[in-house]
């Protein structure tokens, strides 16, 4: 988008030490220290100062780049430079880099802004005949000069509160907003009506506070009460004559208006491209937040294999973010200075979306990882109080312990499987590095990894896993009081038994990697009924049939409480019960 040639550019100082007469390069949004058009004395002679007193506050109930940029009144162009990390912010503007670390955090920010004076150069300074150092125009390092500065200070109080799964995020944020709106009123001496008592005090205690400001504080506030105390002192901290005020907004005049030899801003970045870059970075932030929550999930902390993969994904995304921002930082000044077209930025954005780091593919990985965690968590819920073992060493201690003759382990066998997508992300980063090092041979060798189905997406594996969990759970319940046998759940890599397998250990030795606990048999069939006997035909369930060593049958006369038990200590599936009373009804 061609530069409109506006006579001046207004922008926030963002904590940077901008002063009247300082040179500025709008192509890279950097200030040029140590080089000026005028001497110090000439600058001081023709500066006009006027009072500009104003105080404002606003509540920011959003954590998006857009709303933060709006609070600081950033232009689209300056926002693009911030996205590419061309601008190092300081003071209150450091608030821009603070994002929520969890989706279970409610966040509301209070923005305080005060101004006290406005300084600007007179028109006599801007005449070419008054320029003390005209060589600046030939150097091409700057495009603009600071001709006006608005002084004051700003502060952001950022309040966070953890929200439990049983609470409403919207409701909590609404209550936080109401309480934070009271701070300027109470600090101003106004009477505020509203909720009183222990409940409100409890809510205040649940807040954490972070402070980003242009004021020098002895101690930063960390609680709601601290914030109220600090807020009430802010007006005095500017000093009696406002001597502690800092630049909050500046106005830049193009050097090309003074001399045509000067470097100039050729074109601006289209707002739609800035928005696309902003969306890409915000999505990476969302992925980071999701990962932060997932690594703390019960399933991830129980099985470190899952946790490690999420952490690896998060680290790869952070590396990609840095690479993407470096590309922006390299390309934006070139476009603005006329050295490249906007198509260069379009190519960067397109390549990102078509790479393994594209929005859809990042979402797919996180959704599948969440699906895997939910799948495993459903096992843990079904198994109730069965002990879960997180490490190999802990499992070995249990297996080798002489306290139990048998260890029956429900083994999750596929949690260690390599993630082809993580390998693909790694390769993508390597390819980008190889291109920078101008090694096409290495770049071409980094081929794309073919997609593969996850273990929990295979219907046959899911079916077998459900059967194994049900069988293991029932077997563990029946044998709960058996002191010779211990039941555990563990993660054990085993490609021969994908998904789940039941391991049986006896006296420290692995006896079976595919143990099928015998299930409760179906009701026996009656045959050969005589006056004093009946033949039972046992009807075992298919699952666990191989592990059956005998049967136990119980019977009683209908109406009586006591049962009589008979045990068959072999695998024969027919047995004759004798000694029954004639003309009597029995229940088996």
Q: What function would you assign to each model-found segment?
A:
Residues 1-2, 6, 542, 580-581:
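Elongated, non-catalytic scaffold/linker segments and compositionally distinctive motifs
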Residues 1-336, 388, 442, 450, ...:
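Membrane-permeabilization and membrane-interfacing ectodomains
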Residues 78-80, 87-91, 157, 188-192, ...:
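Structural signal for hydrophobic/aromatic residues that build the beta-strand cores
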Residues 505-513, 563, 584-587:
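Intrinsically disordered, low-complexity segments that are common in secreted/host-exposed effector
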